[in-house]
């Protein structure tokens, strides 16, 4: 099991997650998924941080995981921001880009960083849950550096159009939660719904 953040440094938590995902890449070729899948993709791993509870930190954890795996661990990643209309991660990327464009200091820092990691920033695509899979397929067909992992930042409700369909195509779904009774109950309901309706 993954270590909790309070049990050790946050980097250790992401290192454990990285080791788990890396090991699962090899297993994926030998084991068929238990999720009902319509995907015809090859090696990319689709990952979503999702619950039916809003404001639990899905966008934050998605951005942290994508940035750590891309910038520190060297994986090629991409993010499909399906959390319309706020598009928190896409908005953050636009603000970062504007800041770099307007400041020679930050431009120099960015150039130095990308030179060190020998790659550009990972792509962030603004989408919605209904069109997320099509946008991911289009992005994968166009990208020169094919992502190893594609993260999907999902809306905070299962009632949004396309959420269940998109989640049904994930290789891994992580459900962030806090130590709160209502959050835990909501997350358990989400897991039961997923098990009963989308697992074969």
For the regions a protein language model found, what residue spans apply to each?
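Short, well-ordered alpha-helices that flank and scaffold nucleotide-derived cofactor binding pockets
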Residues: 63, 67-71, 94, 168, ...
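P-loop/Walker-type NTP enzyme "switch/lid" segment
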Residues: 50-56, 71-150
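Short, function-defining helix-loop hinge/capping sites that tune catalysis or transport
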Residues: 62, 89-91, 149, 160-161, ...
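Extreme N-terminal, non-catalytic leader segments
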Residues: 5, 9-50
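Walker A (P-loop) phosphate-binding motif
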Residues: 39-75
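Conserved catalytic-core segment of NTP-binding enzymes
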Residues: 78, 155-200
């Amino acid at each position: 099991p993954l270590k909790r953040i309070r049990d050790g440094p946050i980097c250790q938590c992401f290192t454990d997650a990285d080791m788990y995902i890396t090991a699962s890449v090899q297993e994926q070729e030998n084991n068929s998924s238990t999720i009902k899948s319509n995907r015809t993709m090859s090696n990319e791993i689709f990952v979503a941080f999702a619950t039916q509870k809003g404001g639990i930190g899905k966008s934050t954890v998605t951005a942290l995981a994508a940035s750590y795996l891309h910038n520190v661990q060297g994986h090629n990643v991409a993010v499909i921001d399906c959390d319309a209309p706020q598009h928190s991660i896409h908005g953050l990327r636009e603000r970062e880009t504007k800041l770099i464009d307007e400041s020679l200091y930050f431009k120099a820092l960015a150039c130095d960083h990308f030179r060190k990691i020998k790659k550009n920033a990972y792509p962030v695509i603004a989408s919605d849950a209904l069109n997320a899979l099509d946008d991911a397929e289009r992005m994968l067909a166009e990208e020169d550096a094919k992502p190893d992992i594609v993260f999907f930042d999902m809306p905070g409700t299962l009632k949004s159009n396309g959420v269940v369909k998109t989640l049904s195509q994930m290789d891994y779904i992580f459900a962030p939660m806090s130590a709160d009774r209502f959050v835990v109950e909501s997350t358990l309901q989400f897991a039961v719904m997923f098990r009963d309706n989308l697992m074969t």
